[in-house]
């Protein structure tokens, strides 16, 4: 997709962070917007940022873990705009817990949003993207979809799942030659609210970690501004890239994993232990 003018983009998690910046930058390029988020106040803030651009915008309060709600939203988008060209499955949450301490409730919570939300969004919009004749799906994984880390088993699992799902989807779309493509995004630490909304289990104390300190450390890792991330994503869509790594941290982690696919886990354990002793 060479340009976004007069295209229609559906974005989940559009009330803050990367989703909000995608909306702003697409509006600047003349893209009509179907924005959704579970946070209505955040959506209102995003609308305030894009309202002066000559594009149509709809706002929908949406829980991406609700399949019917996502399907209804996709239908409404097609009815409102007559077409959908871009889908950004961006909504996500974080969770820190040991495997032993991970509750089934928390595991289902994070999978329902991070993985099933992506599946629902992809499947609900795919027929409309094909109808448009020129479509693109962008699914947000993570650098934790490239490597695993202690206390991140559930989060890792969801992001590895998004990666596998999207890479398989891209191959199928290539074989179909249907005019629709897909990109998997692996952001490093992006300066968003994900750390503040993350669930922190006391079980990580068994590894010598303090939940409050872990949350502060997580926040310090968030270096890349969301507008920079959004720019990289849109550039990747225009170039039809299969995968995009965002941030120096994601690029370094990816390189280390390629060089030593199993050895990196020992290094990660060492670094985690070193941090907890500080």
Where are the language model's segments positioned?
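Residue(s) in the substrate-gating loop at a strand-loop-helix junction
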Residues: 142
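Conserved glycine-rich cofactor-binding loop
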Residues: 8, 15-17
């Amino acid at each position: 997709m060479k340009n976004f003018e007069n295209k229609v983009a559906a974005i989940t998690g559009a009330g803050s962070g990367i989703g909000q910046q995608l909306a702003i930058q697409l509006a600047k390029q003349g893209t009509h917007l179907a924005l959704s988020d579970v946070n209505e106040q955040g959506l209102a803030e995003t609308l305030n940022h894009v309202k002066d651009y000559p594009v149509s915008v709809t706002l929908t309060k949406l829980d991406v873990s609700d399949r019917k709600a996502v399907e209804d939203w996709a239908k409404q988008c097609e009815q409102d705009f007559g077409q959908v060209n871009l889908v950004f499955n961006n909504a996500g949450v974080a969770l820190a817990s040991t495997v032993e301490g991970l509750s089934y409730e928390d595991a289902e919570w994070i999978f329902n949003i991070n993985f099933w939300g992506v599946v629902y969004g992809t499947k609900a919009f795919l027929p409309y993207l094909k109808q448009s004749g020129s479509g693109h799906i962008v699914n947000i994984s993570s650098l934790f979809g490239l490597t695993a880390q202690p206390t991140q088993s559930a989060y890792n699992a969801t992001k590895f799942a998004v990666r596998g799902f999207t890479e398989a989807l891209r191959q199928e779309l290539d074989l179909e030659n249907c005019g629709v493509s897909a990109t998997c995004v692996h952001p490093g630490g992006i300066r968003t609210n994900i750390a503040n909304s993350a669930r922190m289990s006391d079980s990580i104390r068994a590894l010598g970690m303090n939940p409050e300190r872990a949350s502060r450390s997580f926040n310090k890792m968030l270096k890349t501004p969301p507008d920079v991330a959004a720019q990289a994503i849109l550039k990747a869509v225009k170039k039809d890239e299969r995968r995009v790594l965002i941030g120096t941290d994601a690029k370094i982690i990816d390189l280390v994993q390629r060089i030593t696919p199993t050895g990196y886990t020992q290094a990660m354990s060492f670094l985690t232990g070193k941090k907890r002793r500080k």
